[in-house]
From Swiss-Prot:
The lineage of its organism: Bacteria, Bacillati, Bacillota, Bacilli, Bacillales. This is Acetyl-coenzyme A synthetase. It comes from the Bacteria. Acetylated. Deacetylation by the SIR2-homolog deacetylase activates the enzyme. It comes from Bacillus subtilis (strain 168). It holds the Pfam family AMP-binding_C. Keywords: Acetylation, ATP-binding, Cell membrane, Ligase, Magnesium, Membrane, Metal-binding, Nucleotide-binding. Mg(2+) binds at residues 477, 479, 482. The gene is acsA.
Amino acid sequence: MNLKALPAIEGDHNLKNYEETYRHFDWAEAEKHFSWHETGKLNAAYEAIDRHAESFRKNKVALYYKDAKRDEKYTFKEMKEESNRAGNVLRRYGNVEKGDRVFIFMPRSPELYFIMLGAIKIGAIAGPLFEAFMEGAVKDRLENSEAKVVVTTPELLERIPVDKLPHLQHVFVVGGEAESGTNIINYDEAAKQESTRLDIEWMDKKDGFLLHYTSGSTGTPKGVLHVHEAMIQQYQTGKWVLDLKEEDIYWCTADPGWVTGTVYGIFAPWLNGATNVIVGGRFSPESWYGTIEQLGVNVWYSAPTAFRMLMGAGDEMAAKYDLTSLRHVLSVGEPLNPEVIRWGHKVFNKRIHDTWWMTETGSQLICNYPCMDIKPGSMGKPIPGVEAAIVDNQGNELPPYRMGNLAIKKGWPSMMHTIWNNPEKYESYFMPGGWYVSGDSAYMDEEGYFWFQGRVDDVIMTSGERVGPFEVESKLVEHPAIAEAGVIGKPDPVRGEIIKAFIALREGFEPSDKLKEEIRLFVKQGLAAHAAPREIEFKDKLPKTRSGKIMRRVLKAWELNLPAGDLSTMED
């Protein structure tokens, strides 16, 4: 990294002095900003919406929504009313009670946000699903969570295998002309009849409110449960890291199927009473730059992949738009390349602030802040109230510049509460000494900045999304031509990594480009488009351990011309 440190930004930031705040901050201070600190009545969705609707912010715009067909805005008062309506629909027609799982499987739209907030208001645990998921991925998540209700659209309805999900009692369909039946309910018709007044279910701090499924390198996706207490850290990171101010227009580009789109696309901004922008439809530079110009976006949270795609569109494209409203730009999902930081400085005249966290942590943990110098390529420093370290495999802290496990001291407010139906997996995240081990390798420099070095396991980060190789391999071997498959992440200048599959064919099948395309489509239709291999290489056989596990590190060594390391466990 030959880029010089970018100096702290002058200005009236919410986090004024990092070192001083880090020394003295206590999470109890953050609790004072919530109505439940006085009333004892606690619900994250109430705090995000109703608290403002019952204050001087009631007529403030909470949501700007736009896509190719819709251009709408909703005040906090209207958000309260529409989410109340959604809560009443789920209660009356879905028999939803406290603790029930309600999954939302639909593209971005205002209704998605009304329904998620309404579900949480009545005590349900909301589970967002990415719209690109195919039947197999949807079934796995609904089955594991024992979801009682799923909300979808007519286009996605056929991907929900209702007859294979005995716990699923009701399917609500939003938009279109879906006929209500035994367990299919037309949401739009039901919502018209419902009151905008709702009896809110008051919760305890440790009651669940969000269930996000995340991929690992082995096993099926795991359900990470977050509890209402997480709102404390979601609020505080919105204040410090996003640096949200009363007058800000804020845009997080992430889909709510991913944890960033929920935590930083819903809760952090609205807990802070900010105006939130949601853009539906596909990415295009014209749409994105046009949104910033049209709505006067001040704070923008996106991902390195998106920034690289904007880079690819050329500086001339950016120059066509007035982007001077931007005050603060942030990135998440994968390490931020120095060339993207350089480009951001040139095109926006702004620093891009990298942030690090993961589904399991529930909110940002290690970040770059406006009040602090940025070392390009560094993750930054831990937020006040969080202790981070580099530890060895026994949990001993390592000195500066020694690479090891990136670990966080247990007990921050947004830490996952459990892994759904898998307490043993939850316990496996922790080391002696109370350390949560992230699965990332990193080192810390002498000034306390952390530097990401890669995944300890094999999870693939493609376009900012985590893809578990095991899930892709499992789908691949369902194809009749495939005997065995191994999947790795291959470095890519635009997407960070792409998925590459090594495949051994069954007897009677011959390698061909036509077969590659058929296999790619098979995974796309069975899992999701982003999970389909972009490269496929046929092999006579794949390297395996004696117990039969594919040795992905050997595949990666083949691909990148690296030493394969210890091969003592490989079968002959």
